[in-house]
Amino acid sequence: MRLKDKVAIITGGSRGIGFATADAFLREGAKVAVAASSEKNAEAAVEKLKAIHPDAEVVGISPNLGSFESVKEEFDKVEKQFGRIDILVNNAGVSESTPFTSYTEADFDRVIDLNVKGVFNATRAVVDGMIKNHSGVVLNTSSMVSISGQPSGFAYPASKFAVNGTTISLARELGPKGIRVNAVAPGITETDMMKAVPKNVIEPMIAQIPLRRL
């Protein structure tokens, strides 16, 4: 098991890519904290994961990723329980498909606060401990639309472009301190979040996929 006894926090871990990541990490022997938007969602995810991995060590937390104080408080609980934090997966994110001419400041802030500020808050909460241990991994979930853009909902690709820049900068700064910082950029993926995206937005994206499917 490649991650045996490693301690990982996965934001947005209650569904979609985050839940699949938690499942994979547990299968590889990691101890996992699933961070979700609510205590109810976190507990539901933990219950599902324990049904798959009865002997696994997995807990749920529900930080407000827009608040550093909330994130630090919840992450400290994980560190207190497991002794350290080895891996942070910044996966939580929100997307929408509002045309630019209908965008409001509140729409923009909602996306940026979670997708960009949330990455800062979560990473800032763990990095001191990782530096002290001269070891750690930060993995950010970006998106292919950070490169290609998309025809509606401009704030999502803009936020993921910011994640790319954050990843590169932190990799340069933290690498000499023993911390690896990387990003993955999935294409359009069939998750719960995509159910809210209209067909007229999804279909042109699917047309660009060689297999013509999600």
What are these regions (language model features)?
Residues 7, 14-16, 38:
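Conserved glycine-rich cofactor-binding loop
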Residues 39, 62-73, 105:
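The beta1-alpha1 cofactor-binding region of Rossmann-like NAD(H)/NADP(H)-dependent oxidoreductases
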Residues 98-101, 148-154, 176-177, 212:
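Active-site loop immediately N-terminal to the catalytic Tyr-X3-Lys motif
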Residues 99-100, 104-112, 194, 202-205:
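Substrate-binding pocket helix/loop in short-chain dehydrogenase/reductase
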Residues 123, 159, 167:
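Active-site helix of classical SDR
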Residues 128, 172-176:
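Alpha-helical segment proximal to the catalytic Tyr-Lys
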Residues 143:
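Residue(s) in the substrate-gating loop at a strand-loop-helix junction
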